[in-house]
Amino acid sequence: GSIERIEIIACGTSKHAAMVGSFLLEQFSGIPTNVFYASEFRYSPPPLLPNTLTIGVTQSGETADTIAAIDMEIKRRSSIEDKKFKPNLIAITNRKESSIGRQVLNIIDICAGIEVGVAATKTFFAQLLSFYGLAIKFAQIKGNQSPDEIGKLINELIKLPPLLEDLLEKHNKSSEKLAHDFFNIKDVI
């Protein structure tokens, strides 16, 4: 059957991407979408509704709460014979060979590479782009956007790489200047 509802399960930075993703999915496709913190989902799951797509979002593919919540959702839905309640899952991750990759058949591999810093900048942005693409695809399938509007949305995505390159280049120059200016300073308040 057709997807009538979307549940997104995530933790941390992935949950923030999921919150933006839920907005995009609802705005573009018109499908009601809810975001759940994975640990809360496990202990207070929403009522089972038919034709629900569950999306698990985890940068590493190993986030324990997200994996446990997805596993619980698979078991809950598999215990019902009505096909409208069957598990319908997608995972968005940076590691398709991870635990979530083995757990979920449909994987969106964000291909962001290794995240060096603590702040998940590359993976966060890649998750946002994944949600944007998913929202466009659902809008196309549902017919909620005209072909012209879909084309405009895709063209806006195509414009992003050179804009980001310019932004990073400007940021690198200002960062280098700040580092040079503060290099010999011992204390900062």
Segments (PLM) and residue ranges:
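Glycine-rich phosphate-binding loops that contact phosphosugars or nucleotide phosphates
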Residues: E4-K159
